[in-house]
Amino acid sequence: MLNISISKFSYGKKEVLNDIHIQIEKPKIIGLVAPNGTGKSTLIEIIAGNLNNRDVSVLLDDKNYKNHYLDMKRRIVRMCNQDDLYSDLTGLQHLQFYAEMWNIKPAFVDEVVSKLQMAEYISNKVSSYSLGMKQRLCFALVVVTNCEVMLLDEVMNGLDPDNVQLISKVLRSLKNEGKIIIIASHLLNNLNSIADEVFFLKDKRIALKYQLEDQCNQSLEIQFSSVDRYKEFTQQFMNMNMNILSNPSELLISMKDLNELDSIFLWIQSNLKDISSLTYGIKGCEIIYQELFHSNDEGRE
């Protein structure tokens, strides 16, 4: 199990993250979504052990970076950037270097090359690679480590639809092997198809956790005009899957059982004057993103 706790994290006087508590069981694919510059990459770097302070804790099966640094680094890998690649080396040399660092057998390198369909160009120098080829190599370097936790920041960047489909297939197979995979991405429809859960980062914290299975469920969004009714509702229906949206009086509820909906609507009928808006339907990552980050854009110049 991976546990991440961040009381606060700042760059100088600028606070970037606070009050973040995440618990992830194996195996799982987690999507991480937020606009640029709001802390996604910082969170990835913290999980990778590249950023730290006294208010940060990352535990993998009760081990941490402070007391088990090398072991954690062998078990958690972050995808490198294309700028980290060496132009004068071949893709195969990159993979062999990573395999040696993680004590991986050469046969597994060949397996990764085959799985990612890179044989045609893997022995060429990286300087000859297209953007998509470089991105696939960066992903292959993660896969070849065979780490338990894989951190991917915009892994689909620069890839055509065929390659997005290929990498998505590999990600699913890695999950089936028992991995935890965390993907920071703007391709929301892709996350809809591969992620078990998607974390939406807003106002320096995880504002909403959306489970993939919720796409098969009805969702009810309620905005309360009365704080007292909001508290009363959350107490009465505390066993339901609820997420706070853009303010403390706005809830997103996922329902599998229509009987749950009946009981909620009965409550709503008795308290209708204290509810300012009500939306019912099926949501996906794209709709949730728009509501979280652009719900107040209407009417602006």
Predicted regions, residues:
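ABC transporter nucleotide-binding domains
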Residues: 9-16, 20, 26-177, 182-183, ...
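Short, charged/small-residue-rich alpha-helical element at the C-terminal edge
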Residues: 220-292
